[in-house]
Structures are given as structure tokens and as C-alpha cells.
């Protein structure tokens, strides 16, 4: 996913040598993006929060990311927290020579996860009744399901979300402590 976002931006000329990459993340995207940026020579700044595991914050830093850590309400992941992380990232993205990967609105993430769908089919090499995946940006579930649905297996796709924040299934927002999923609102442009 991170490599797909960076390489897609490079191919379109939106990201060039010397630029800084910015993103908001609870850890998985941020760690991956920091790693890809380190390999490719880009500076990386991640807006995250103390609601996410210290190990995730440490991993992003270890891969070279500079962090802006937003305080949470007692460690809870809420729509308001995610919106504040996005707001701060959008402000950072206003600076010259900065590229915002914008994971919730970046079509490259789906293409990045299509490779995972192809690998699942190749490795299992047998019918797949169902595929379950948690939803954060939804890129993983969309990319994998796109490939699985093209197969002759008729795979059922199931999105998973915390019981206390069933936004996709009921529209109900709620706080939870499941990192990396359930932002409790839609942020599509």
C-alpha cells in the first residue's frame, strides 16, 4: 500500500526528489510509509496519536519518520481524533515541496492490495468461500476483493468492524480501542 502510494505519485510527477511525504496514521500505514520513504530518500512526517501503541510510534520513528502526536481522550480512538489528525496533516501538506499521500482518498492503495489478492489466490490454489477483513481505509478489503471476485470461486467478502463502532453496518459511531480500523465516518472527496 505505502509503496503503491509513493510510486503512483512519482509516476504522476506529484512526488519528486527532495520533497517531504506527510500522512496521518495509527501505525501500520505510517510504519510502511516511513520505511518506503527511507529507502527512496524522502523525508517523512506522520501525524499520529497517543491512542495508538507506543511500539507503533517507536517503529515509525525507527524508520526515520518525524511524528506529530495528537493527544487522545483517555486512549480512545474516535471520529473526532481521526478528524484532528487529518486536519493537522492537511495543514502540513500546505507547505511547498510536501506531498500528502491522503490514504482515505488515494486510489493507489487499492492497486497496492490487488497484489495481495492475487497472492492469496496463488498460494491457496483452491476455492475460497469467504474473505474477512477489517476496514480502516478500506483499501485492503477493496483491493483483495476486486481480485477475489474476478476468480471463479464466488468468494463472499465480509467487512469487520468493532461492535462498539458499527459505522459501516448501522451508521452508529462509537469509541473503541481497536487500532487501525473503524474511523467512524466517511472522508471521501
Predicted regions: what is each one?
Residues 1-17:
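Positively charged, low-complexity intrinsically disordered leader regions
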Residues 15-49, 128-140:
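A short, small-residue-rich loop immediately preceding and capping a beta-strand
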Residues 29-89, 168-182:
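Active-site-proximal loop->helix
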Residues 186-187:
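Conserved small/polar residues in nucleotide/adenosyl-binding loops
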Amino acid at each position: 500500500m505505502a509503496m503503491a502510494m509513493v510510486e503512483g505519485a512519482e509516476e504522476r510527477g506529484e512526488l519528486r526528489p527532495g520533497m517531504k511525504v506527510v500522512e496521518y496514521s495509527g501505525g501500520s500505514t505510517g510504519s510502511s510509509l516511513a520505511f518506503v520513504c527511507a529507502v527512496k530518500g524522502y523525508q517523512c512526517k506522520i501525524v499520529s496519536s497517543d491512542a495508538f501503541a507506543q511500539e507503533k510510534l517507536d517503529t515509525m520513528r525507527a524508520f526515520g519518520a518525524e511524528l506529530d502526536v495528537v493527544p487522545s481522550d483517555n486512549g480512545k480512538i474516535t471520529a473526532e481524533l481521526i478528524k484532528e489528525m487529518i486536519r493537522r496533516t492537511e495543514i502540513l501538506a500546505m507547505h511547498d515541496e510536501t506531498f500528502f499521500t491522503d490514504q482515505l482518498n488515494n486510489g493507489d492503495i487499492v492497486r497496492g492490495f490487488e497484489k495481495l489478492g492475487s497472492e492469496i489466490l496463488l498460494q491457496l490454489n483452491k476455492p475460497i468461500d469467504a474473505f474477512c477483513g477489517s476496514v480502516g481505509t478500506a483499501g485492503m478489503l477493496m483491493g483483495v476483493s476486486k481480485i477475489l471476485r474476478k476468480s471463479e470461486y464466488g468468494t463472499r467478502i465480509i467487512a469487520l468492524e468493532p461492535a462498539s463502532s458499527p459505522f459501516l453496518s448501522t451508521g452508529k459511531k462509537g469509541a473503541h480501542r481497536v487500532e487501525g480500523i473503524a474511523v467512524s465516518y466517511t472522508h471521501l472527496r
